[in-house]
């Protein structure tokens, strides 16, 4: 494998994981904060808010996992070689 392609793949993998974690991390923090605020305002809808929050957190975390899959593909099954 060419050294330049190998180095570029490692950098791309690092960027894939890093950038894929930034958006969902910010979104999860915002969603959790808003959920706590909503539960504090209306404690009677605690179960509905918590269920919706957990489902949305799972969807956001899937984006990070997709970034990890792309990074692993770049590192171990390099399509550029």
Curated annotation (Swiss-Prot):
What this protein is called in its record is ATP synthase subunit C, cyanelle
The record's subcellular location field reads: Plastid, Cyanelle thylakoid membrane
Query: Can you cite an annotated GO cellular component?
Result: plasma membrane
Keyword set, alphabetical order: ATP synthesis, CF(0), Cyanelle, Hydrogen ion transport, Ion transport, Lipid-binding, Membrane, Plastid, Thylakoid, Transmembrane, Transmembrane helix, Transport
Keyword Nuclease assigned: no
* Transmembrane region(s): 7-27, 57-77
Q: What is its main location?
A: plastid
Record-linked PANTHER family: ATP SYNTHASE LIPID-BINDING PROTEIN, MITOCHONDRIAL, ATPASE PROTEIN 9
Per the record, the domain of life is Eukaryota
Coiled-coil positions are none
């Amino acid at each position: 494998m060419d050294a330049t392609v190998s180095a570029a793949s490692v950098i791309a993998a690092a960027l894939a994981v890093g950038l894929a974690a930034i958006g969902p991390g910010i979104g999860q923090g915002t969603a959790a904060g808003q959920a706590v605020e909503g539960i504090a305002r209306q404690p009677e809808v605690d179960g509905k808010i918590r269920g919706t929050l957990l489902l949305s957190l799972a969807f956001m975390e899937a984006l990070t996992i997709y970034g990890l899959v792309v990074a692993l593909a770049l590192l171990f099954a390099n399509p550029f070689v």
